[in-house]
Swiss-Prot record:
The enzyme's E.C. designation: 2.5.1.41
Keyword terms: Cytoplasm, Lipid biosynthesis, Lipid metabolism, Magnesium, Metal-binding, Phospholipid biosynthesis, Phospholipid metabolism, Transferase
Main location: cytoplasm
Reaction(s) the record says it catalyses: sn-glycerol 1-phosphate + (2E,6E,10E)-geranylgeranyl diphosphate = sn-3-O-(geranylgeranyl)glycerol 1-phosphate + diphosphate
Keyword ATP-binding: no
Gene Ontology MF terms: magnesium ion binding; phosphoglycerol geranylgeranyltransferase activity
Protein name: Geranylgeranylglyceryl phosphate synthase
Organism: Sulfurisphaera tokodaii (strain DSM 16993 / JCM 10545 / NBRC 100140 / 7)
Keyword set includes Lipid biosynthesis: yes
InterPro entries in the cross-refs: GGGP/HepGP_synthase_I, GGGP/HepGP_synthase_sf, GGGP_HepGP_synthase, GGGP_synth
Sequence intervals crossing the membrane: none
Length: 244
């Protein structure tokens, strides 16, 4: 998956990932929603959520998505959300957590399981900014203010120096505003290899385009897919047409 993602980015594309929260999604409608997202240009599916997620439902969603050629990637909140049915897993460390469990503890428990399942891992530095939402509360994150560019950049550089392939800047599910394009632009200048993933609070194609042009490599939307699919499809189409 890492190679596929990198090849697309090397072509100058900006990628869109659709996030499905197993606790919120309707299994009966997910196939038709996924079909529209793929037809609009989404590059991958992230499956996961912070609360109320069972492995059984995670497996069910991935099985429904099997017909689609785009990657199915686990977006884990804990060690119980690991399945061999996925193509890969975001092997995330919540870098600005005050609880070591979310920095290296859960990862220590998960690592042998991931190895045994031969599941491809995508090393990711997860950094919660601004609103933070449920993920910040559960993960005991020391949330970075939207305008503290210096701290966001420092955490991002740290992720890259740790050898992480991705820096995931997260404003939180349902955030009142997304991470600012100016923050992305400045952060991008300091990263040589790590790719920037941005999620949270992205509600229209205009802000998605601004984030993409500012330097985001992958843009994630989740809530908007559940709340207003037509708007979500516009975002996907806008991103899939961008070349840098």
């Amino acid at each position: 998956m890492r190679k596929i993602i990198q090849e697309k980015l090397n072509e100058g594309k900006v990628l869109h990932f659709s996030l499905f929260d197993p606790d919120k999604v309707d299994l009966e409608s997910i196939y038709s929603i996924a079909l529209k997202l793929v037809e609009s240009g989404t590059s991958g599916f992230l499956i996961g959520g912070t609360l109320g997620v069972s492995k059984e439902k995670l497996d069910s969603i991935i099985e429904i998505l099997e017909d689609f050629e785009v990657p199915k990637i686990i977006f884990p909140s804990n060690v119980n959300l690991i399945t061999e049915k996925a193509d890969a897993i975001l092997f995330m460390s919540l870098l600005n957590s005050d609880d070591i469990y979310y920095i290296t503890g859960a990862q220590l428990i998960a690592a042998p399981i991931i190895k045994k399942l031969k599941l491809e891992s995508l090393p990711t530095g997860y950094i919660i900014v601004g609103h933070g939402g449920t993920a910040a509360h559960v993960g005991k994150a020391r949330v970075i203010p939207y305008d503290n560019i210096e701290l966001i950049v420092a955490y991002s550089i740290m992720a890259e120096l740790f050898g992480m392939d991705f820096v995931y800047l997260e404003a939180g599910s349902g955030a009142p505003e997304p991470i600012r394009p100016s923050v992305i632009s400045i952060t991008k200048k300091y990263l040589e290899n790590s790719k920037i993933i941005v999620g949270g609070g992205i509600r229209n194609e205009e802000i998605a385009k601004e984030l993409a042009l500012a330097g985001a490599d992958i843009i994630v939307t989740g809530n908007i897919i559940e709340q207003n699919l037509e708007k979500a499809l516009k975002i996907v189409k806008e991103i899939s047409n961008i070349r840098r």
